[in-house]
Amino acid sequence: FFSCDVLEKKPNEMSEELIWTANDEYPTVIECENVVDTKDRLNCFYEYLYEYLSNNLKNSHDVKNLEFNDSIMIKIIVDKNGNVYPSEIIFKNLEYNSEKINSIIYELLDSMPKVVPAVKTDYGVKVKSQFDLPLILNIKK
């Protein structure tokens, strides 16, 4: 049995060195580009990430023999080229095999298809962005 749930807390807004304005564009994926509202598009991107991680963790041979039930916070970076990678994974409890889960999540995000990076519209440039992705992982043998 495997489950991956979204925590009630909404992910934090993007954090970057430049001041973010309402007209700037958050990172997204092709599946979300037709969503007009900025917040809805960002939520579509988060849902894409949740589904990507959930489906790939569920189908990973590496998790088949693990027991894991914890809340985690993945600090994700999307660079200006659209590469996605975690800068840090924080586990609420350390009683589980967090090193193995940590390794699996790093591999999954490193192998994730490129996304559309954030755009600083007043400068017309693609920028690196960072945000927190909270998850509850419940893996049972």
Question: What do these predicted regions represent?
Answer:
Residues 4-141:
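Charge-biased low-complexity segments
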